[in-house]
Amino acid sequence: MRLFLALLALGFAAVAAVPANPQRIVGGSTTTIQQYPTIVALLFSRNGNTFFQACGGIILNNRNILTAAHCPHGDAVNRWRVRSGSTFANSGGAVHNLNRVRIHPNYNSRTLDNDIAIMRTSSNIAFNNAAQPARIAGANYNVGDNQVVWAAGWGDIRSGGPPSEQLRHVQVWTVNQATCRSRYASIGRSVTDNMLCSGWLDVGGRDQCQGDSGGPLYHNGVVVGVSSWGEECALARFPGVNARVSRFANWIRNNS
Protein backbone atom coordinates (compact mmCIF):
# COMPACT_ATOMS: atom_id res chain seq x y z
CA MET A 1 0.00 0.00 0.00
CA ARG A 2 0.99 3.59 -0.46
CA LEU A 3 1.16 5.53 2.76
CA PHE A 4 -1.38 8.31 3.03
CA LEU A 5 -1.30 11.05 5.61
CA ALA A 6 -3.99 11.71 8.19
CA LEU A 7 -4.51 15.03 9.94
CA LEU A 8 -4.34 14.42 13.67
CA ALA A 9 -5.07 16.76 16.55
CA LEU A 10 -1.37 17.11 17.27
CA GLY A 11 -0.03 17.15 13.74
CA PHE A 12 0.44 14.84 10.77
CA ALA A 13 1.32 11.16 10.85
CA ALA A 14 1.73 8.38 8.32
CA VAL A 15 -0.80 5.59 8.40
CA ALA A 16 0.73 2.21 9.25
CA ALA A 17 2.64 0.54 6.43
CA VAL A 18 0.48 -2.58 6.24
CA PRO A 19 -3.27 -1.83 6.33
CA ALA A 20 -6.01 -3.81 8.00
CA ASN A 21 -7.34 -4.77 4.58
CA PRO A 22 -5.33 -5.54 1.47
CA GLN A 23 -5.86 -3.18 -1.32
CA ARG A 24 -5.91 -0.42 -6.17
CA ILE A 25 -5.07 2.23 -8.57
CA VAL A 26 -7.54 5.14 -8.45
CA GLY A 27 -9.22 6.24 -11.69
CA GLY A 28 -7.59 3.59 -13.86
CA SER A 29 -8.64 0.41 -15.59
CA THR A 30 -7.78 -3.26 -15.50
CA THR A 31 -4.77 -4.53 -17.41
CA THR A 32 -2.65 -7.68 -17.60
CA ILE A 33 0.79 -8.71 -16.44
CA GLN A 34 1.82 -9.13 -20.09
CA GLN A 35 1.46 -5.35 -20.43
CA TYR A 36 3.54 -4.80 -17.27
CA PRO A 37 5.81 -7.84 -16.90
CA THR A 38 8.25 -5.89 -14.72
CA ILE A 39 5.83 -5.52 -11.79
CA VAL A 40 5.43 -8.03 -8.96
CA ALA A 41 3.05 -8.33 -6.03
CA LEU A 42 4.66 -8.30 -2.59
CA LEU A 43 2.83 -10.57 -0.19
CA PHE A 44 2.81 -9.96 3.57
CA SER A 45 1.88 -12.24 6.47
CA ARG A 46 1.13 -11.20 10.04
CA ASN A 47 1.28 -14.78 11.32
CA GLY A 48 3.76 -16.40 8.94
CA ASN A 49 1.07 -18.61 7.43
CA THR A 50 -1.48 -16.56 5.50
CA PHE A 51 -0.05 -14.12 2.94
CA PHE A 52 -1.88 -11.29 1.15
CA GLN A 53 -0.83 -8.64 -1.36
CA ALA A 54 0.29 -5.53 0.51
CA CYS A 55 2.78 -3.71 -1.77
CA GLY A 56 4.18 -3.72 -5.27
CA GLY A 57 7.70 -4.24 -6.51
CA ILE A 58 9.81 -3.98 -9.65
CA ILE A 59 12.00 -6.72 -11.12
CA LEU A 60 15.65 -5.62 -11.37
CA ASN A 61 17.09 -8.99 -12.37
CA ASN A 62 16.34 -12.66 -11.68
CA ARG A 63 17.00 -12.33 -7.95
CA ASN A 64 16.37 -8.70 -6.95
CA ILE A 65 13.20 -6.63 -6.50
CA LEU A 66 13.04 -2.86 -6.09
CA THR A 67 10.36 -1.55 -3.72
CA ALA A 68 9.58 1.16 -1.17
CA ALA A 69 11.51 0.95 2.10
CA HIS A 70 8.39 1.57 4.18
CA CYS A 71 6.90 -1.73 2.99
CA PRO A 72 9.35 -4.17 4.66
CA HIS A 73 10.85 -1.74 7.19
CA GLY A 74 10.92 -3.33 10.64
CA ASP A 75 9.67 -6.72 9.47
CA ALA A 76 11.41 -10.08 9.53
CA VAL A 77 12.33 -11.15 6.01
CA ASN A 78 10.16 -14.27 6.26
CA ARG A 79 7.04 -12.10 6.62
CA TRP A 80 7.30 -11.21 2.91
CA ARG A 81 7.10 -13.13 -0.35
CA VAL A 82 7.11 -12.12 -4.03
CA ARG A 83 4.55 -13.18 -6.64
CA SER A 84 5.88 -12.74 -10.18
CA GLY A 85 4.25 -13.34 -13.53
CA SER A 86 0.60 -12.98 -12.52
CA THR A 87 -2.14 -10.51 -13.40
CA PHE A 88 -3.73 -11.36 -10.07
CA ALA A 89 -2.61 -10.26 -6.63
CA ASN A 90 -3.22 -13.47 -4.74
CA SER A 91 -3.09 -16.28 -7.29
CA GLY A 92 -1.13 -17.50 -10.29
CA GLY A 93 2.44 -16.92 -11.38
CA ALA A 94 5.34 -18.02 -9.20
CA VAL A 95 5.79 -17.24 -5.51
CA HIS A 96 9.32 -16.72 -4.19
CA ASN A 97 10.58 -16.58 -0.62
CA LEU A 98 13.07 -13.87 0.30
CA ASN A 99 16.46 -14.20 1.95
CA ARG A 100 17.46 -10.54 2.26
CA VAL A 101 16.00 -7.06 2.44
CA ARG A 102 18.33 -4.11 1.99
CA ILE A 103 16.84 -0.75 2.96
CA HIS A 104 18.51 2.46 1.81
CA PRO A 105 20.88 3.57 4.60
CA ASN A 106 19.43 7.08 4.61
CA TYR A 107 15.79 6.04 4.72
CA ASN A 108 13.79 8.24 7.09
CA SER A 109 10.64 6.53 8.34
CA ARG A 110 9.20 9.85 9.58
CA THR A 111 9.59 11.93 6.41
CA LEU A 112 9.75 8.96 3.98
CA ASP A 113 12.85 10.45 2.38
CA ASN A 114 14.99 7.86 0.54
CA ASP A 115 12.01 5.50 0.57
CA ILE A 116 13.62 2.70 -1.39
CA ALA A 117 14.72 -0.88 -0.74
CA ILE A 118 15.88 -4.00 -2.56
CA MET A 119 14.55 -7.47 -1.74
CA ARG A 120 16.47 -10.57 -2.78
CA THR A 121 14.58 -13.74 -3.65
CA SER A 122 15.70 -17.18 -2.51
CA SER A 123 15.11 -18.61 -5.99
CA ASN A 124 15.58 -17.30 -9.52
CA ILE A 125 12.70 -15.54 -11.25
CA ALA A 126 12.11 -17.25 -14.59
CA PHE A 127 11.79 -14.67 -17.36
CA ASN A 128 8.98 -14.98 -19.91
CA ASN A 129 6.28 -12.74 -21.38
CA ALA A 130 4.84 -12.22 -17.89
CA ALA A 131 8.08 -11.58 -15.98
CA GLN A 132 10.90 -9.35 -17.24
CA PRO A 133 13.58 -7.08 -15.74
CA ALA A 134 12.69 -3.40 -15.81
CA ARG A 135 14.49 -0.53 -17.47
CA ILE A 136 15.55 1.68 -14.58
CA ALA A 137 16.20 5.43 -14.86
CA GLY A 138 19.90 6.27 -14.73
CA ALA A 139 21.47 9.06 -12.71
CA ASN A 140 21.12 11.54 -15.60
CA TYR A 141 17.54 10.64 -16.52
CA ASN A 142 15.51 13.80 -16.08
CA VAL A 143 11.74 13.88 -16.42
CA GLY A 144 10.25 17.26 -17.26
CA ASP A 145 7.06 18.77 -15.88
CA ASN A 146 3.69 17.63 -17.22
CA GLN A 147 5.09 14.48 -18.80
CA VAL A 148 2.79 11.51 -19.29
CA VAL A 149 3.65 8.71 -16.86
CA TRP A 150 1.88 5.46 -16.05
CA ALA A 151 1.38 3.78 -12.70
CA ALA A 152 0.37 0.17 -12.16
CA GLY A 153 -0.58 -1.87 -9.13
CA TRP A 154 -3.16 -3.70 -7.07
CA GLY A 155 -3.93 -0.86 -4.65
CA ASP A 156 -7.20 0.74 -3.53
CA ILE A 157 -9.63 2.30 -5.99
CA ARG A 158 -10.03 5.10 -3.41
CA SER A 159 -8.75 5.89 0.06
CA GLY A 160 -9.95 3.02 2.23
CA GLY A 161 -11.50 1.37 -0.81
CA PRO A 162 -11.98 -2.32 -1.62
CA PRO A 163 -9.18 -4.53 -2.88
CA SER A 164 -8.49 -5.19 -6.56
CA GLU A 165 -7.51 -8.73 -7.39
CA GLN A 166 -6.66 -7.81 -10.99
CA LEU A 167 -3.76 -5.54 -11.93
CA ARG A 168 -4.77 -1.98 -12.81
CA HIS A 169 -3.02 0.95 -14.46
CA VAL A 170 -3.61 4.67 -14.80
CA GLN A 171 -2.16 7.55 -16.81
CA VAL A 172 -1.06 10.56 -14.77
CA TRP A 173 1.36 13.45 -15.29
CA THR A 174 4.52 14.62 -13.58
CA VAL A 175 4.04 17.65 -11.36
CA ASN A 176 6.41 20.61 -11.05
CA GLN A 177 8.66 20.05 -8.05
CA ALA A 178 8.26 23.56 -6.61
CA THR A 179 4.49 23.34 -6.90
CA CYS A 180 4.38 19.95 -5.23
CA ARG A 181 6.73 21.11 -2.48
CA SER A 182 4.60 24.19 -1.82
CA ARG A 183 1.34 22.25 -1.70
CA TYR A 184 2.69 19.78 0.85
CA ALA A 185 4.49 22.47 2.87
CA SER A 186 1.05 23.98 3.51
CA ILE A 187 0.16 20.89 5.55
CA GLY A 188 3.55 20.45 7.18
CA ARG A 189 5.02 17.81 4.86
CA SER A 190 8.41 17.89 3.17
CA VAL A 191 8.96 17.03 -0.50
CA THR A 192 12.69 16.56 -1.11
CA ASP A 193 14.78 16.30 -4.25
CA ASN A 194 14.67 12.52 -3.77
CA MET A 195 10.94 12.56 -4.55
CA LEU A 196 8.94 12.80 -7.78
CA CYS A 197 5.33 13.97 -7.77
CA SER A 198 2.66 12.73 -10.15
CA GLY A 199 -1.09 12.97 -10.56
CA TRP A 200 -3.75 15.08 -12.25
CA LEU A 201 -3.08 18.39 -10.52
CA ASP A 202 -6.11 20.55 -9.71
CA VAL A 203 -8.40 17.94 -11.26
CA GLY A 204 -7.80 14.80 -9.22
CA GLY A 205 -9.42 11.43 -9.61
CA ARG A 206 -6.28 9.57 -10.77
CA ASP A 207 -3.50 8.36 -8.53
CA GLN A 208 -1.72 5.51 -6.83
CA CYS A 209 -3.21 4.54 -3.48
CA GLN A 210 -2.84 2.15 -0.56
CA GLY A 211 -1.53 -1.16 -1.82
CA ASP A 212 0.44 0.47 -4.64
CA SER A 213 3.47 1.32 -2.48
CA GLY A 214 6.70 0.07 -3.96
CA GLY A 215 5.19 -0.24 -7.41
CA PRO A 216 6.46 1.44 -10.57
CA LEU A 217 5.88 4.81 -12.20
CA TYR A 218 6.85 4.53 -15.88
CA HIS A 219 7.95 7.24 -18.31
CA ASN A 220 8.20 5.87 -21.85
CA GLY A 221 8.62 2.41 -20.38
CA VAL A 222 11.42 3.43 -18.00
CA VAL A 223 10.85 3.19 -14.25
CA VAL A 224 11.32 6.73 -12.95
CA GLY A 225 9.44 6.45 -9.65
CA VAL A 226 8.63 4.04 -6.84
CA SER A 227 5.23 4.70 -5.26
CA SER A 228 5.74 6.13 -1.77
CA TRP A 229 3.16 8.40 -0.10
CA GLY A 230 0.50 11.06 -0.49
CA GLU A 231 -2.32 12.97 1.17
CA GLU A 232 -5.13 10.42 0.91
CA CYS A 233 -5.44 9.43 -2.77
CA ALA A 234 -6.30 11.25 -6.01
CA LEU A 235 -7.04 14.63 -4.41
CA ALA A 236 -6.99 17.58 -6.81
CA ARG A 237 -4.69 19.67 -4.64
CA PHE A 238 -2.19 17.00 -3.58
CA PRO A 239 -0.38 14.77 -6.09
CA GLY A 240 1.08 11.38 -5.31
CA VAL A 241 4.71 11.22 -4.24
CA ASN A 242 7.23 8.66 -5.51
CA ALA A 243 10.86 7.96 -4.72
CA ARG A 244 12.78 9.49 -7.65
CA VAL A 245 14.67 6.52 -9.09
CA SER A 246 17.38 8.53 -10.85
CA ARG A 247 18.60 9.77 -7.46
CA PHE A 248 19.26 6.17 -6.42
CA ALA A 249 20.62 4.75 -9.67
CA ASN A 250 24.11 4.08 -8.34
CA TRP A 251 22.86 2.58 -5.08
CA ILE A 252 20.46 0.32 -6.97
CA ARG A 253 23.20 -0.86 -9.31
CA ASN A 254 25.65 -1.50 -6.46
CA ASN A 255 23.14 -3.47 -4.38
CA SER A 256 21.48 -5.65 -6.99
Swiss-Prot record:
Sorted keywords for this record are: Disulfide bond, Hydrolase, Protease, Secreted, Serine protease, Signal, Zymogen
Per the UniProt entry, the disulfide pairs are C55-C71, C180-C197, C209-C233
- Enzyme Commission number: 3.4.21.4
Tell whether Cytoplasm is among the UniProt keywords: no
Quick check: keyword Nuclease in the entry?
A: no
Q: Mind listing the GO biological process terms from this record?
A: proteolysis
Show which residues constitute the signal peptide: 1-17
Q: Which GO terms describe its molecular function?
A: serine-type endopeptidase activity
Recorded catalytic reaction(s): these are:
Preferential cleavage: Arg-|-Xaa, Lys-|-Xaa
Annotated active site residues, numbered on this chain, are: H70 (charge relay system), D115 (charge relay system), S213 (charge relay system)
UniProt tissue specificity: Midgut.
Site (Required for specificity): which residue positions? D207
Which EC class does it fall in?
hydrolase
Q: A Pfam family for this UniProt protein? A: Trypsin
Query: Can you give the propeptide residue ranges?
Result: 18-24
- Choose one Gene Ontology CC annotation of this protein and give it: extracellular region
The protein's matches in SMART domains, at most eight in alphabetical order, are given as: Tryp_SPc (SM00020)
- Location relative to the cell: Secreted, Extracellular space
Superkingdom is Eukaryota
Query: Peptidase S1 domain: from which residue to which, for each copy?
Result: 25-256
Name the protein family: Belongs to the peptidase S1 family.
Q: Return the protein name.
A: Trypsin, alkaline B
